[in-house]
Amino acid sequence: MTEATLAEWHPLGAIDEFTEDEPAARVAGQKPIAVFRIGDELFAMHDLCSHGHARLSEGYVEDGCVECPLHQGLIDIRTGAPKCAPITEPVRVYPIRIVDGQVEVNVG
């Protein structure tokens, strides 16, 4: 791995900080990130809806989707794909890894 590749991974916090009950808002590489936990898996996506630019970390989570708090459109947490109107454009998702109990995201 090159230094540039290593630099793209940013710390988000300890794995215990992330619960299924509540999405978490973080900033990594000057980008707003929403972190979601589904069971034992963690997912990260850009923390702005592609339709109304609302914070997805403030949305309601159910059945693997987050509901935009502004217009109630649904976005698949795993893929960022829009699931219903008014959202038509996907939201960028980011890879996550866990290193020694710490969650990291690659925003490169």
Swiss-Prot record:
Q: Which residue numbers delimit the Rieske domain?
A: 9-105
Q: Does the keyword Glycoprotein apply?
A: no
**Superkingdom assignment:** Bacteria
Q: In which pathway does it act?
A: Aromatic compound metabolism; anthranilate degradation via hydroxylation; catechol from anthranilate: step 1/1
Print the keywords alphabetically: 2Fe-2S, Aromatic hydrocarbons catabolism, Electron transport, Iron, Iron-sulfur, Metal-binding, Transport
The answer, when asked if Methyltransferase is one of the entry's keywords, is no
Which amino acid positions bind [2Fe-2S] cluster, per UniProt? 49, 51, 68, 71
- Please share the entry's free-text remark on the cofactor: Binds 1 [2Fe-2S] cluster per subunit.
User: What does its record list under induction?
Assistant: Expression is positively regulated by the transcriptional regulator AndR.
The coenzyme or cofactor needed here is: [2Fe-2S] cluster
What Pfam family is a match, any one?
Answer: Rieske
One GO biological process from the UniProt record? anthranilate catabolic process
Q: Name one GO molecular function term.
A: 2 iron, 2 sulfur cluster binding
Subunit organization = Part of a multicomponent enzyme system composed of a reductase (AndAa), a ferredoxin (AndAb) and a two-subunit oxygenase component (AndAc and AndAd).
UniProt family annotation: Belongs to the bacterial ring-hydroxylating dioxygenase ferredoxin component family.
**Biological role:** Part of the multicomponent anthranilate dioxygenase, that converts anthranilate to catechol. This protein seems to be a 2Fe-2S ferredoxin.
Q: What is this protein called?
A: Anthranilate 1,2-dioxygenase ferredoxin subunit
